[in-house]
């Protein structure tokens, strides 16, 4: 039901209306052009609306109409491979309607209402179906079966259910109380979708990135943050996670970042193969593009839109990874709206409720038993862009209180061309202990011990670096000289990874383990040789050691590694270290 009021005041993206009988979070059409907005505050007879489009030229006295509905997304077949703006308008539809530059007041349906999908019923006539249970299935892509579910807030006995080709608006099921159900339903973005219960994460998200999988793993259903200064590799790391994570669905939210970065994703993903299925990566991806040149207020909507789409697929029992790049831009949008509302500012001008909003977002991630009895997960990975790389600023600090994995990007590493530029001394993962059993069973019994040994060595190296910078490495005892050489190998062979190399971009667990095992084998044999009287300089000069870094780029990895290890054994035997 539409209720009409009029605009009283305009302050940037915030519009105040009078005579509007609206509820909190109702959608409104603002001004003569019908700009989309959302009610964020009601004070006395005044309704305050944040507008998701540019408000230039909107003036007091123009009409303002409430739709009586909250900001909701359309959920149903046809979501995958889509690219939306922050309020689920498909960008290709907007392109057809308005050309390259999006005009104001344009509306578009989130799903294609004309396309036919083959619906196969699962529920039968006479079945009592509760909210979240499966009515039927649609084969959306070659590898993904889209489960058409009863909306979570409805239930009833099936009176009639159809089979065949239908659009998302046609009725496929009728309940005994007369309720007609379609393949599509709408869900408010600010309301988390219900689940039976939350579960403890038990499996790692396999990313194919050695430093992440090996040293700082994130669990499926976990939360992680990637803070870092400009140019340190946040977006490339996020894109690597989008490409190679072993989840069935990836939702990539480009929130206030450059448009070129979304263009990169659109350019690369259709050409890249998913290592799990061999199909184009775009088939499992949904993009929510809310770039830096789009209106500020829509950034907030884009984060909630992305999370609601992720929850929908989680409810089907799929594992979803959600990339938010960058949460700092979302926080800056909150700061702007807050200042327009003349609220009391908190630290650095951010609103006092910043930490509550961030927590609200990350808490919607997790592993859950869904209403249909399946087990699904959402892994939320948020990039943070602190000004000047200052991790003490409010967005980074509030994010670190919430997330369990911290991948700290370091400008100094990126300047040295060490990528991924994740600082192994500042980063941490609180899932390590929970995932140790999985690594022991699925990778190797000595995997955890090897990882801890490597971390201890890297820690010792950082302590020795201060002495080395003062007096040089030659002044150190030979044992410590060897340790520095081994840690250099860990850094350059294991931790460094080329995102743009066709082979090195993705490293399976078996390969990661063998690389680390080879480095440790060299380290143990080198220490034994040193104890038996071989000078450290002789051990460091070995040819096989210098061939080891090339192995990770070879297609025949196992064959190349075996040849290098055999050569290493001969060289150590010649030195008399064994």
UniProtKB/Swiss-Prot annotation:
Compartment(s) where it occurs, according to its Swiss-Prot or TrEMBL record: Cell membrane
Family: Belongs to the ATPase alpha/beta chains family.
Positions bound to ATP: 228-235
Name this protein carries in UniProt: A-type ATP synthase subunit A
Organism of derivation: Methanosarcina acetivorans (strain ATCC 35395 / DSM 2834 / JCM 12185 / C2A)
Lineage: Archaea, Methanobacteriati, Methanobacteriota, Stenosarchaea group, Methanomicrobia
Keyword Protein transport: no
NCBIfam families given in the database record: ATP_syn_A_arch, PRK04192.1
Function recorded in the entry: Component of the A-type ATP synthase that produces ATP from ADP in the presence of a proton gradient across the membrane. The A chain is the catalytic subunit.
Enzyme Commission number(s) from the entry: 7.1.2.2
GO terms for cellular component: plasma membrane; proton-transporting two-sector ATPase complex, catalytic domain
A GO term, aspect molecular function: proton-transporting ATP synthase activity, rotational mechanism
A GO biological-process term: proton transmembrane transport
């Amino acid at each position: 039901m539409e209720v009409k009021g009029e605009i009283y005041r305009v302050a940037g993206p915030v519009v105040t209306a009078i005579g509007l009988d609206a509820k909190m979070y109702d959608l409104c059409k603002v001004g003569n052009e019908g700009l989309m907005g959302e009610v964020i505050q009601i004070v006395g007879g005044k309704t305050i609306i944040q507008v998701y489009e540019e408000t230039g030229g909107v003036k007091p006295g123009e009409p303002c109409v409430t739709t009586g509905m909250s900001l909701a997304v359309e959920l149903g077949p046809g979501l995958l491979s889509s690219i939306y703006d922050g309020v689920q308008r498909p960008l290709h539809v907007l392109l057809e309607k308005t050309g390259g530059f999006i005009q104001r007041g344009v509306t578009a349906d989130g799903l294609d209402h004309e396309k036919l999908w083959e619906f196969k019923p699962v529920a039968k006539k006479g079945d009592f179906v509760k909210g979240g249970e499966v009515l039927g299935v649609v084969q959306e892509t070659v590898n993904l079966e889209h489960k058409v579910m009863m909306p979570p807030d409805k239930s009833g006995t099936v009176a009639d259910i159809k089979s065949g080709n239908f659009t998302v608006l046609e009725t496929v099921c009728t309940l005994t109380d007369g309720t007609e159900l379609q393949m599509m339903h709408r869900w408010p973005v600010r309301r988390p979708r219900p689940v039976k219960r939350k579960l403890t994460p038990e499996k790692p998200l396999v990313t194919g990135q050695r430093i992440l999988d090996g040293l700082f793993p994130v669990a499926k259903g976990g939360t992680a943050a990637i803070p870092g200064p400009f140019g340190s590799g946040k977006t490339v790391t996020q894109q690597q996670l989008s490409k190679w994570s072993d989840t069935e669905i990836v939702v990539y939210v480009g929130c206030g970042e450059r448009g070129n970065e979304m263009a990169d994703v659109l350019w690369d993903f259709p050409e890249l193969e998913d290592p799990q299925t061999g199909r184009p990566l775009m088939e499992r991806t949904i993009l929510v593009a809310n770039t830096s040149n789009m209106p500020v207020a829509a950034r907030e909507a884009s984060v909630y839109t992305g999370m609601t789409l992720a929850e929908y697929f989680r409810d089907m029992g799929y594992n979803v990874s959600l990339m938010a790049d960058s949460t700092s831009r979302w926080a800056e949008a909150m700061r702007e709206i807050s200042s327009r509302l003349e609220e009391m500012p908190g630290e650095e001008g951010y609103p006092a409720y910043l930490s509550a909003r961030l927590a609200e977002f990350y808490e919607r991630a997790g592993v859950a038993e869904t209403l249909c009895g399946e087990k699904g997960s959402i892994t939320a990975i948020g990039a943070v862009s602190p000004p000047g790389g200052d991790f003490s600023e409010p967005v980074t600090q509030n994010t670190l209180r919430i997330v369990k994995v911290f991948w700290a990007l370091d400008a100094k590493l990126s300047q040295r061309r060490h990528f991924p530029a994740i600082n192994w001394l500042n980063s941490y993962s609180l899932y390590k202990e929970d995932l140790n059993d999985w690594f022991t069973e699925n990778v190797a019994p000595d995997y955890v011990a090897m990882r801890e040994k490597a971390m201890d060595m890297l820690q010792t190296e950082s302590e020795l670096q201060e002495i080395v910078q003062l007096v040089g490495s030659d002044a150190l005892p030979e044992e410590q000289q060897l340790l520095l050489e081994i840690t250099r190998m860990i850094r350059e062979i294991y931790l460094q990874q080329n995102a743009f190399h066709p082979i090195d971009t993705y490293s399976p667990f078996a390969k990661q383990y063998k690389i680390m095992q080879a480095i440790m084998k060299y380290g143990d044999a080198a220490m034994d040789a040193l104890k038996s009287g071989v000078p450290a300089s002789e051990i460091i000069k070995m040819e096989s050691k210098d061939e080891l870094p090339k192995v990770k780029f070879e297609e025949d990895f196992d064959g190349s590694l075996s040849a290098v290890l055999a050569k290493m054994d001969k060289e150590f035997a010649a030195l008399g270290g064994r």
